[in-house]
Amino acid sequence: AYEWLSEMNETMDPAYVTDEVIDGMTNAEKDIAVMYSGDATNVLTENMDMSWVAPKQGTNVWIDAMVIPKNSNCPGLANKFIDYIISESVQSQNAEWVGYTPVDKSVEEELAGPDGEFFENPAFVPRTGYHLDETFHFDEQLKAKLSDLWNKVKVQ
């Protein structure tokens, strides 16, 4: 990846940005971007000339999580908040706002169905079970190496 990004730096004028890419893609100011499926869902909702592609070579799979620290002062309140967030109505509202696939299958089916907010939006329900997709687990040594290479790419 380092060599590919270095070569890209020499042949193109890439922009290494974060959330700014969402508006850039929505407004068709950029030709390609790496983004989370929820962000892509929102881009496609605003601009159907864009498309969502998961590479045949595989991609990383991510899962957002809600956790309660062991030393929490209010674990009961934290659990109530999580219960609220995963309630059907709030999952639906949250998914409509952020574009991320809800954990409740019935909410997903409603939003992705013919009368749903994200009908025929390929980014809303990303593929699952693809044999080349991975969930990455970084160790400190690998994280340091990746950070070093990324910094070299950005300063080229």
Task: Spell out what each predicted region is.
Residues M8-M12, E29, S37, L44, ...:
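Sec/Tat-exported extracytoplasmic proteins
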Residues A1-P55:
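Ligand-binding pocket segment of bilobal, Venus flytrap-like solute-binding proteins
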Residues Y2-S6, I22, T26, V34, ...:
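Non-transmembrane alpha-helical segments in soluble domains
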Residues P69-Y130:
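Mature extracytoplasmic/periplasmic domains
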Residues D64-M66:
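Short amphipathic alpha-helical segments
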Residues M48-N60, P69-S72:
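Short beta-strand->loop
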Residues Y16-D19, N27, S72-G76, E88, ...:
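Soluble non-cytosolic domains of exported or imported proteins
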Residues P126-Q156:
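Conserved C-terminal helix/tail region of periplasmic/extracytoplasmic solute-binding proteins
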